[in-house]
Amino acid sequence: MSMGPISELLTVSYPIAETFHSLQGEGAWAGGNAFFIRLGGCDVHCPWCDQKETWPTQHHPRQTVTELVQQAVTAKPSFVVITGGEPLMHDLQPLCKTLKNQGLRLHLETSGAYPLTGQFDWITLSPKPYKLPQAAIYPLANELKVIISQDEDFDWAEMEARKISPGTPLYLQAEWETEAMNEKIFAYILTHSQWRLSLQTHKYLGVR
């Protein structure tokens, strides 16, 4: 998408599953004051996904950049999280540019399955074996978060970690409905010290 005048950017719209103000529950920024923009649309189709309702793009009402930015500014968060679904199915440049113009810090949560659009202060790469990440996303990731739902996923995690820039924080997170995996992740990290545990803190707190 070519970037026209700011007035044109404001009228660009996206399918929005939800927006909400809460604490970031996962990864390096867990506990931080965050405003979430959850875009509709995903064709990665993880069988254990806890956001399957976001998959069909056409099922979600569209909101303009103006509407989304107004909500984010009103929330006064420490950072804005653009998530999904798979947000990179959409051209995020108009939204990112306008949010940045308001001085907001931007975080992205992505599987990396599509090319990166927009400028972000932090990129959480959560690769999925069902649709592999674009090679170009690996050196841009600020953290790697791998979901563990079965024993074989540990091998997948190690394979993905080898593609990430040295020193990038590495997280293992249990799929929510197989919470027993937390014990296996705990034991795994004790013998693989490069990894850290990510918990879905917001779910334990019973908040969004």
Swiss-Prot record:
Belongs to the radical SAM superfamily. 7-carboxy-7-deazaguanine synthase family. This is 7-carboxy-7-deazaguanine synthase. Catalyzes the complex heterocyclic radical-mediated conversion of 6-carboxy-5,6,7,8-tetrahydropterin (CPH4) to 7-carboxy-7-deazaguanine (CDG), a step common to the biosynthetic pathways of all 7-deazapurine-containing compounds. Residues 29-208 form the Radical SAM core domain. It is an enzyme of class 4 (lyase). It comes from the Bacteria. PROSITE patterns: RADICAL_SAM (PS51918). Homodimer. Pathway: Purine metabolism; 7-cyano-7-deazaguanine biosynthesis. S-adenosyl-L-methionine binds at G85, S126, P127, K128. Its cofactor is [4Fe-4S] cluster; S-adenosyl-L-methionine; Mg(2+). PANTHER family: 7-CARBOXY-7-DEAZAGUANINE SYNTHASE. Keywords: 4Fe-4S, Iron, Iron-sulfur, Lyase, Magnesium, Metal-binding, Queuosine biosynthesis, S-adenosyl-L-methionine. Substrate binds at L23, Q24, G25, R38, T83.
